[in-house]
Amino acid sequence: MHCPFCSATDTKVIDSRLVSDGHQVRRRRQCLACSERFTTFESAELVMPKVIKSNGNREPFDEDKLSGGLYRSLEKRPVSADLVELALNTIKSQLRATGEREVPSDMIGNLVMDQLKELDKVAYIRFASVYRSFEDIKEFGEEIAKLEK
């Protein structure tokens, strides 16, 4: 690690601690050349699979798009931001757990629907109506009937 003060390459770690619920390591370092101290944070770089769209195009996974869809479905619903973040992390973990380099967009949509079904039934219906392109009231009724079973 280069010292941010003198650019020397020799530094030593004085202290290491887990932060962010164990997902990050905070290290206190000291430069061996100028004796200045500084803090670094280390976390794993997790690679998300590419998304195969329904038209066959491939694009990088977009976390903002995923969270935007979840938050839009949950707009004005009594669900805490912490629960939404937990749902987002669950979806991302499930995608990484596939071990695939590419996943179809409908898989992501189904994972979102599974999470919304647990979080809020109204948000689930909102998302399903757009995701499945409901054409009329009958389709809403059928989806609601499935939820009530």
From Swiss-Prot:
Signal sequence bounds: none
UniProt-recorded Gene Ontology molecular function terms: ATP binding; DNA binding; zinc ion binding
Does the record bear tRNA processing in its keywords? no
Kindly state a single biological-process term from the GO annotations of this entry: negative regulation of DNA-templated transcription
Zinc finger residue ranges, unnamed: 3-34
What cofactor requirement does the entry state? Zn(2+)
Q: Which UniProt keywords apply?
A: ATP-binding, DNA-binding, Metal-binding, Nucleotide-binding, Repressor, Transcription, Transcription regulation, Zinc, Zinc-finger
The cross-references to InterPro entries, in alphabetical order and at most eight, read: ATP-cone_dom (IPR005144), NrdR-like_N (IPR055173), RNR_NrdR-like (IPR003796)
- Entry superkingdom: Bacteria
Which stretches make up the ATP-cone domain? 49-139
**Pfam families recorded:** ATP-cone (PF03477), Zn_ribbon_NrdR (PF22811)
Q: Tell me how the cofactor is bound.
A: Binds 1 zinc ion.
Recorded family membership: Belongs to the NrdR family.
Known function: Negatively regulates transcription of bacterial ribonucleotide reductase nrd genes and operons by binding to NrdR-boxes.
Enumerate the PANTHER family for this protein.
TRANSCRIPTIONAL REPRESSOR NRDR (PTHR30455:SF2)
UniProt protein name: Transcriptional repressor NrdR
- Which organism's genome codes for this protein? Aliivibrio fischeri (strain ATCC 700601 / ES114) (Vibrio fischeri)
